[in-house]
Amino acid sequence: MSAGDVHVTGGPASAPADDAAYEDSEQGYAAGLRAWDGLPGIPASSGALIRDSRGRILVLKPTYKSGWTIPGGVMEANGETPWEACQREVFEETGLRVSAGRLAAVDTRPAKARRAMGLRFLFDCGVVTDEQAASITLQSTELSDHAFLAPSEALARLRPAVSRRVAAVLETGGCRYLEDGRPVAGVPDE
């Protein structure tokens, strides 16, 4: 290393040379907790893009807010991953079990008055059979209706931020990084 170069490791100057071993040690774990303690949390949620055999998108009508949305919801603070949240929410809301999905987008929702910044993960969970589509059982405390709609009709019915997110994914088919549902200059698609 030449003068002016900096090498940052996961622990203090007295940490072992093996960063992974340090992070797994009690000392490293405690140091990690102290480093994160007091930092603000960022709310995160996961959603599922689910289609039927005719390419129509599954949309849901919530009882607790206006407009339509896609299956999904908030990640639990118990260590749940975005994919686990997607699977859990789809099952809770529709009775469908999704076992495969592709990360389609990560969307940063900007902070607004009385609302913190948030992260939204969108997974493309593929196509359900006609039998699976017919078996959907809605979570009645949160949802009043569902429909499979042609993409253009689904985009028109979805809440604006969700519509932008889904449209961005449908546009490229790759994984997208978005901010408020919009592509970001300088961040190429997958």
Regions found by a protein language model. Name each.
Residues 47, 56, 145:
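Conserved beta-strand and immediately adjacent loop positions that scaffold enzyme active sites
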Residues 75-99, 107-162:
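Unchanged
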